[in-house]
Amino acid sequence: GFMTKYDVYAESNVVLKLEDFEADAFGQKDSGVAIQKALEKAKALSDEGKSVTLMFEKDGLYRVTKENALEREVHTSNTDSVDFPVKKIGVLVEGIKNLTIEGNNSHIVFEGDMMYLRIFQSENIKVNNLSWDVKVASTTEMSIFNVNEAGNEVYFLFRRHSHIRWKIGG
């Protein structure tokens, strides 16, 4: 039969729902494996020439932990890539073309020291309406407002940003 441009687009665009891959939109369980399974399916569809939209649930809260993160050798400017070239990656988009990640105002909380999102050897990748943060920051920002020298010692007085949680132990 006769096909319009819209019909051709509809057949070549596939929507993958994250919930179909057993992701937990309530933030109780780690969704890292589910997200990566969905991205593996997206890659397979991409290899067939299809465009893919990966759909998060509306206003979801997703956890991604270091324990289930993928590993890749990555050289970046802000890490020790010579001694530690292998990095954990929370969400890895690799070798995919024509992917839209529709977050639907969802939020990912990354737990553990890892690269949060890596897009590698991919083309035409869009990320919409998705935010993320870390459960515990691996670095802390502060402002130094005074430096004192006493003999061979240097003392810094700093002011932490109000949103930083901290404790000094010893």
Tell what function each PLM region has.
Residues 114-170:
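Right-handed parallel beta-helix
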Residues 1, 7-8, 133-136:
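Extracellular, surface-exposed passenger/stalk and repeat segments of large secreted bacterial proteins
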Residues 1-5, 41, 156:
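Short intrinsically disordered, low-complexity coil segments enriched in acidic
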Residues 13-15, 53, 124:
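A residue-level signal for beta-strand positions that form part of recognition/binding surfaces
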Residues 10, 100, 169-170:
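Short, intrinsically disordered, charge-balanced linker/junction segments flanking boundaries
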Residues 21-26, 36-39, 43, 48-99, ...:
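N-terminal extracellular ligand-recognition/capping segment immediately after the signal peptide
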Residues 3-35, 60:
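Right-handed parallel beta-helix/beta-solenoid
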